[in-house]
Amino acid sequence: MPELPEVETVRRTLLQLVKNKTIADVDVGWPKMIKEPDDVERFIQLLKGQTIEDIGRRGKFLLFVLNDYVLVSHLRMEGRYGLYQPTDEKTKHTHVVFSFTDGSELRYADVRKFGTMHLFAKGAEHVAMPLAQLGVEPFSEQFTVELLEQAYAKTTRAIKTALLDQKTVVGLGNIYVDEALFHAGIHPERTASSLSKEEYHNLHKEIKRTLKEAIEAGGSSIKSYVNGQGEIGMFQQQLHVYGRKQQPCHHCDTAIEKTVVGGRGTHYCPNCQPRP
């Protein structure tokens, strides 16, 4: 699933392609993707004539800011956007097409069909699901060491499980939680409430650093991820633990191990991240 660095990269690349384009029509081939409004024809009619003023991001969600509405889109496992001409061949996995007045098309393709779209009146998107219960952005002033300490002070959950919960801090998924915990020297099965202030400080720093470097590299293309221009990310070449089971740790040469934490495959170095 695309995490914050991938979604941010898609946002940046798409914005260059579709900003100020006006929607002439919309074709929805898989109505189940449209969650709000629940009437697909109304979804289409509301979008006609709307111009894309900006594209924002909230956690792992893309926010297409229009004249009167905000389209909230989640890519889920394998969703992707791309700009095409009407003569370009459509893949069988293309499920939503936004046709612009200049003749170009923004296409949404999704092999798994798990992606979702919600259309809200501008200003209402943050007080409605799915955005209403999201935590703070990791690059915001609200993301502090104290926030992590207070949020996890009484939890019995493993630190990895706690970080994956989007209600405290958003955008973190399997890849970047594993990487941040490695760089902070914290075992993923440590109870979150057992971390010291120094460990929280290191974790806070490594979350921000890891995400920043991943964005600079265009995200991680582990399976099918590409950005809005169809380009793969390069951060997978910098991963220290994720997807490196039985390979030597870059710091100490110990074999990377894989376990399951909270139902998620989890990679760590048993030497650099000692068990609790």
Curated annotation (Swiss-Prot):
<keyword id="KW-0227">DNA damage</keyword>
<dbReference type="GO" id="GO:0006284">
    <property type="term" value="P:base-excision repair"/>
</dbReference>
<dbReference type="InterPro" id="IPR012319">
    <property type="entry name" value="FPG_cat"/>
</dbReference>
<dbReference type="Pfam" id="PF06831">
    <property type="entry name" value="H2TH"/>
</dbReference>
<feature type="active site" description="Proton donor; for beta-elimination activity">
    <location>
        <position position="60"/>
    </location>
</feature>
<feature type="zinc finger region" description="FPG-type">
    <location>
        <begin position="240"/>
        <end position="274"/>
    </location>
</feature>
<dbReference type="GO" id="GO:0003684">
    <property type="term" value="F:damaged DNA binding"/>
</dbReference>
<keyword id="KW-0862">Zinc</keyword>
<dbReference type="Pfam" id="PF06827">
    <property type="entry name" value="zf-FPG_IleRS"/>
</dbReference>
<feature type="active site" description="Proton donor; for delta-elimination activity">
    <location>
        <position position="264"/>
    </location>
</feature>
<keyword id="KW-0234">DNA repair</keyword>
<keyword id="KW-0479">Metal-binding</keyword>
<dbReference type="GO" id="GO:0140078">
    <property type="term" value="F:class I DNA-(apurinic or apyrimidinic site) endonuclease activity"/>
</dbReference>
<feature type="active site" description="Proton donor">
    <location>
        <position position="3"/>
    </location>
</feature>
<feature type="active site" description="Schiff-base intermediate with DNA">
    <location>
        <position position="2"/>
    </location>
</feature>
<feature type="binding site">
    <location>
        <position position="93"/>
    </location>
    <ligand>
        <name>DNA</name>
    </ligand>
</feature>
<comment type="function">
    <text>Involved in base excision repair of DNA damaged by oxidation or by mutagenic agents. Acts as a DNA glycosylase that recognizes and removes damaged bases. Has a preference for oxidized purines, such as 7,8-dihydro-8-oxoguanine (8-oxoG). Has AP (apurinic/apyrimidinic) lyase activity and introduces nicks in the DNA strand. Cleaves the DNA backbone by beta-delta elimination to generate a single-strand break at the site of the removed base with both 3'- and 5'-phosphates.</text>
</comment>
<dbReference type="InterPro" id="IPR020629">
    <property type="entry name" value="Formamido-pyr_DNA_Glyclase"/>
</dbReference>
<protein>
    <recommendedName>
        <fullName>Formamidopyrimidine-DNA glycosylase</fullName>
        <ecNumber>3.2.2.23</ecNumber>
        <ecNumber>4.2.99.18</ecNumber>
    </recommendedName>
</protein>
<keyword id="KW-0378">Hydrolase</keyword>
<keyword id="KW-0456">Lyase</keyword>
<keyword id="KW-0326">Glycosidase</keyword>
<comment type="subunit">
    <text>Monomer.</text>
</comment>
<dbReference type="InterPro" id="IPR035937">
    <property type="entry name" value="MutM-like_N-ter"/>
</dbReference>
<dbReference type="InterPro" id="IPR000214">
    <property type="entry name" value="Znf_DNA_glyclase/AP_lyase"/>
</dbReference>
<keyword id="KW-0863">Zinc-finger</keyword>
<feature type="binding site">
    <location>
        <position position="112"/>
    </location>
    <ligand>
        <name>DNA</name>
    </ligand>
</feature>
<dbReference type="InterPro" id="IPR010663">
    <property type="entry name" value="Znf_FPG/IleRS"/>
</dbReference>
<dbReference type="GO" id="GO:0034039">
    <property type="term" value="F:8-oxo-7,8-dihydroguanine DNA N-glycosylase activity"/>
</dbReference>
<keyword id="KW-0238">DNA-binding</keyword>
<dbReference type="InterPro" id="IPR010979">
    <property type="entry name" value="Ribosomal_uS13-like_H2TH"/>
</dbReference>
<dbReference type="GO" id="GO:0008270">
    <property type="term" value="F:zinc ion binding"/>
</dbReference>
<keyword id="KW-0511">Multifunctional enzyme</keyword>
<comment type="similarity">
    <text>Belongs to the FPG family.</text>
</comment>
<dbReference type="Pfam" id="PF01149">
    <property type="entry name" value="Fapy_DNA_glyco"/>
</dbReference>
<dbReference type="InterPro" id="IPR015886">
    <property type="entry name" value="DNA_glyclase/AP_lyase_DNA-bd"/>
</dbReference>
